[in-house]
Amino acid sequence: DRVCYVNDVSLEGSRLVQTIIYDGNEITGPSDWVVDRKQNRIYLYCTIGKMRMLKAFHLPRLNDSDENGEVHLKAEDSLASIPLCAIAIPRGSLLKGHYAYLPDGLPSRERRLHIVDIVSCQKVANFDLNHIPYEPEGVASRGGKLYLSFHTPRDVRANMVYRFKVEPVK
């Protein structure tokens, strides 16, 4: 299933408040979801045929849910499909401005951070992460810097976060 679980997180705990499901059957391989709150969109980062894509949708509101707390998106609900470069495993991506920051790779393969302009659909940067011996898991930004988390084997409490200053972070 192509599912995004929406949780309400507070200091007291968390609870599932919505499940977003993509009902299209053209997607093969792994997928991930990326939220762009400023543009009120959600992107499905997926593979269609042999092409990695970002499929844009309006970000569902909580009251868009059915009686089961679900929102079902269909192919015809897509606002745009943005072709991406060859990226092995979609995960933990970030949209900021009109850029998608896409970590990629495993210790047994190449590890990179791809930056794609989602307006022009062009790759604008490709950062080599092979000097870091861990698997990139997620990316966030704050104060003009990117924070990239890496999975370390055997102990999730030992995960590493690296800080980068790269353009075009704004």
Q: Predicted regions span which residues?
A:
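Structural motif
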Residues: 2-8, 50-60, 108-115, 155-168
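Recurrent small/Gly-Pro-centered beta-turn motifs in extracellular repeat architectures
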Residues: 1, 44-48, 97, 103-105, ...
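A short beta-strand motif characteristic of beta-propeller blades
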Residues: 15-24, 69-85, 122-128
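Repeated scaffold domains used in trafficking and secretory/extracellular systems
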Residues: 25-37, 83-93, 132-142
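Hydrophobic alpha-helical segments and helix pairs
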Residues: 1-34
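Loop/turn-rich, solvent-exposed surfaces of beta-rich toroidal or solenoidal domains
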Residues: 80-118
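Blade-level signature of beta-propeller repeat domains, shared across WD40, Kelch, NHL, RCC1
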Residues: 137-170
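Short coil/turn segments that connect the beta-strands within blades of beta-propeller domains
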Residues: 38-40, 97-98, 143-144
